[in-house]
Amino acid sequence: MNEFVLEVKFVVKPESLALFNQLIDINAHASVEHEEGCYQFDVLRDSKDECQVLLYEVYKSEEAFADHMSRKHTQEFLAAAKPLIVSQTASRWTRYFAPKVKNV
């Protein structure tokens, strides 16, 4: 079965960045620690504009992603983050190939 990948790009209001960072930290950690089907949850920042945040999430399957979306921590993040962002876009992918990742 191919893994399901989600990329979400947020543009965060500058005055809300500190709170957004706290919220996404909680959500990312809860996702990888408590969801068996969440393999990866990376939070990336644009190197020139810290208000642009990219999430790179890898799940065992679309069903695992649906489980993620139903979780309390995800719902709380989405509700709390909504007033903090200027825009949000998402892209859904199927992982075709990935070489073995090195632990760093």
Question: What kind of feature is each model-predicted range?
Answer:
Residues 26-40, 58-91:
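An amphipathic, aromatic/His-enriched active-site/gating alpha helix that lines ligand/cofactor pockets
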Residues 17-19, 52, 64, 99:
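Intrinsically disordered, low-complexity acidic/polar segments
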Residues 4-34, 38-39:
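N-terminal first-folded block
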Residues 4-11, 40-69:
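Short, well-ordered beta-strand segments in beta-rich or mixed alpha/beta enzyme
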Residues 8-9, 13, 71-72, 96-104:
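Short flexible/disordered coil segments
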Residues 43-51, 78-104:
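Glycine-rich beta-strand-turn "strand-cap" elements at beta-sheet edges
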